[in-house]
Amino acid sequence: MATYITEDCINCGACEPECPNEAISEGDEIYVIDPELCTECVGFYDHEACQAVCPVECCLPNPQIVETEEVLIARAVRLHPDDGELKKRAAANDYPSRFRK
């Protein structure tokens, strides 16, 4: 499921630079995550980077957008067409993912 940022966000900005897909941006009142760019860090980390750095734990799974690991790795490959390493890891089914902990 895509991650979203709750209204508890304190606008510290810690999450934005951690996102490998540039899915996080500053919204009108709080930071927001574009679900079309969010891969839950599948292909990059075995955890969601935004969740790991958020001091108020407001980066949460969005229960309205449930996605499989396969969908998320395909999105990561599509978003990073020039990342040969990511493509190799995806093809070999050997990439970091929170689903594989």
UniProtKB/Swiss-Prot annotation:
Residues bound to [4Fe-4S] cluster 2: 19, 38, 41, 50
One Gene Ontology MF term: 4 iron, 4 sulfur cluster binding
Name the record gives this protein: Ferredoxin Fdx2
Bound cofactor: record note: Binds 2 [4Fe-4S] clusters.
Residues where [4Fe-4S] cluster 1 binds: 9, 12, 15, 54
Taxonomic source organism: Sorangium cellulosum (strain So ce56)
InterPro entries from the UniProt entry: 4Fe4S_Fe-S-bd, 4Fe4S_Fe_S_CS, YfhL-like
NCBIfam families referenced in this protein's UniProt entry, alphabetically: di_4Fe-4S_YfhL
Top-level taxon of origin: Bacteria
PROSITE patterns: 4FE4S_FER_1, 4FE4S_FER_2
Protein role: Ferredoxins are iron-sulfur proteins that transfer electrons in a wide variety of metabolic reactions. Fdx2 can receive electrons from both FdR_A and FdR_B ferredoxin reductases, with a preference for FdR_B compared with FdR_A, and transfer the electrons to the cytochrome P450 CYP260A1.
Pfam families documented for this protein: Fer4 (PF00037)
